[in-house]
Amino acid sequence: ALTAVHMACEQLRQGRCEMAMAGGVTVMITPDGFIGFSQAGMLSPDGRCAAFAASANGFVRGEGAGIVLLKPLTQALADGNPIHGVILGSSLNQDGHTNGISLPCPEAQARLVVDACADAGIDPVKIGYVEAHGTGTAVGDPIEATALSHALCGDRSPEAPLPMGSVKSNLGHLETAAGVVGLIKGLLVLKYGQIPASLHFDAPSEHIDFAALKLRVPTAMESFPKTDGQRMVGVNS
């Protein structure tokens, strides 16, 4: 879904269209996906997505849909449209050669986030919250945490670690719709200035050194970090 959002933004910036709808949908109408993922040992046996937690034991499938309507900011303002947020920049890349779909490349992930920040023209330290991919797997979560830290936390104070969460702990992994659901959650965080808890985070994963990475996972609703400018969130997928 975020690939569609990225491509829509590119078309809008190039003047190829005046507005665009982008998103994704997942409907589980056959058991095939469950069978395949189960045979691969990828699904959580207890049906709970415990992203970045010690109890992370696999991902949880979910179904749903999400769509956003995109327009250039100047045109949306001129038309008097309600504006839920502004996409400052985005990027798209490929994982490259890895040992499998459940073992993503940390270097590629970090480069993607760095490129997105560069496209947005922002200092990564200005990001007050990141909505992570956070599938709840014991191997994938530490890889993503490392990548996000390398991309966003190099100049961040250890006393102010970056909050991150995963909507998959609420809804499961919506697969082709997962990215846009994370984007919508990020927009709601901006709108209300509140960061919700990431569920099922009873204890941090022993494979993630949160202090060293300068990251943290909120376990209760909290206010968005104070900023001297506009609120900014990042979405990784």
Which residues fall in each region the model found?
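Condensing-enzyme catalytic core of the thiolase-fold
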Residues: 1-237
